[in-house]
Swiss-Prot record:
It comes from the Bacteria. It catalyses: uridine(55) in tRNA = pseudouridine(55) in tRNA. It comes from Parabacteroides distasonis (strain ATCC 8503 / DSM 20701 / CIP 104284 / JCM 5825 / NCTC 11152). This is tRNA pseudouridine synthase B. Belongs to the pseudouridine synthase TruB family. Type 1 subfamily.
Amino acid sequence: MDFIAGEILYFNKPLTWTSFDLVNKFRYKLSRKLKVKKIKVGHAGTLDPLATGVMIVCTGRATKRIDEFQYQTKEYIATLKLGETTPSFDLEKEIDAVYPTEHITRELVEEVLKTFVGTIQQIPPVFSACKVEGKRAYELARKGEEVELKSKTLVIDELELLECDLPVIKIRVVCSKGTYIRALARDIGKALGSGAHLIGLERTRIGEVTLDMCMSPEEIDDFLEQNVVKIEEEK
């Protein structure tokens, strides 16, 4: 494999790792193996630290294709806890409000999910990488500053209820670029006349790339050992 000319690799990001952690670890190991000081490495779509799953990583000149992958549809398996909200809409922050769930039934959940299929408007979470006047929203939010984000037009292609063990539900989401599953959880909770936050998230597909095609960070060393071409210096 020619990592400088450009390769496209698939990883399964572990829980608690940032997307940068994964890219940084691979870049470090790759540059050491190639014995070069610098090599371009980038990813095609951020995953939150509390999410796991598919990440596409590009090297060398293949980093020019990152936008192409970012615009492909993505599939997620999300687990939502109904009746409770957090400022981050996931487990990163503590529960800040509790809502009733006694009125929620499986039938109501299925009816509400149908209303989110198609073109929707979504306001991103304030704890996100969206920019506000040149600054990341999460940087402002962590300082306690008020952050106002504009809604974005998104497309939800599929939304399926996989499990319903109230107040916990598990859903499968197929969506367009820019969709925040945390924000979707918030909006589903509101539509149910309650609240909700994410307690689990796995990205299972980007375009045609599925989880079973991905390697774990623990496999990087063996992968590089097998795929870095040892080129002898010409004398």
